[in-house]
Regions:
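Glycine/proline-enriched, intrinsically flexible loops and inter-domain linkers
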Residues: 1-207
Length: 207
């Protein structure tokens, strides 16, 4: 912690594994308030369905961020969207990017969360002297940030071996258990076409 204000870094637990859902920085050396930030992305899902990829990227960023006690709940959060899309190299990618941006905009409007900033990189292609061309998958990286009321109350992702404790699975999506764009599909060298998404944004915000 170079500045002395780092309240939550990437490594957690006795083994210092990089498990943190979010990063948290204190605003000063004596107070309890701070700023939390978290990331979300779903490039595999976006290959099959650009709209679902955008929704999943926002969802991941938000579900990573909520482990910090946000001062005003979801109203504390602002997002940044970094669009990395091979529009100049691949036919049809302009249309896919439009669908992805619109889906992210619509989803954030329903969640009542603003996206005041972002950036774009629209080449995302590497060309070689022999004519070979490598095209990156269209991806949006969503950064979520918000004010934290108490940096000492950030929930850790480290599990404790306690028989009296319980692990819960909470369904935020109200969707079917789809495998498109999943790690399982990737392990089979596939992408899939049946991609999960969030069916009820209002419930997602409440949860």
């Amino acid at each position: 912690s170079v500045t002395g204000k780092i309240a939550r870094q990437q490594c957690q637990g006795e083994l210092q594994l990089p498990l943190s859902d979010c990063g948290v920085v204190a605003l000063d050396y004596r107070g309890e308030k701070g700023i939390a930030t978290a990331l979300g992305h779903a490039p595999q899902a976006a290959l099959a369905n650009p709209e679902a990829g955008s929704v999943l990227a926002v969802s991941e960023a938000l579900t990573n961020l909520v482990w910090a006690p946000l001062a005003e709940g979801m109203d504390s959060i602002s997002l940044s969207a970094n669009w990395m899309w091979p529009c100049r190299a691949q036919e049809g990618e302009d249309a896919r990017l439009y669908k992805a941006v619109k889906a992210l905009s619509d989803f954030c409007c329903e969640l009542q969360i603003n996206v005041p900033t972002g950036k774009d990189s629209l080449s995302m292609t590497q060309k070689y002297p022999n004519g070979e061309k490598i095209i990156s998958p269209g991806t949006v990286i969503v950064s979520a940030g918000g004010e934290v009321s108490d940096v000492k109350k950030v929930v850790s992702p480290v599990l404790v071996n306690d028989e009296k404790s319980t692990i819960y699975h909470i369904d935020f999506s109200f969707d079917k258990l789809r495998l498109g764009g999943s790690a399982f599909a990737q392990s089979l060298n596939k992408v899939g076409d049946d991609v999960p998404t969030v069916q009820n944004p209002e419930y997602f915000r409440d949860a």
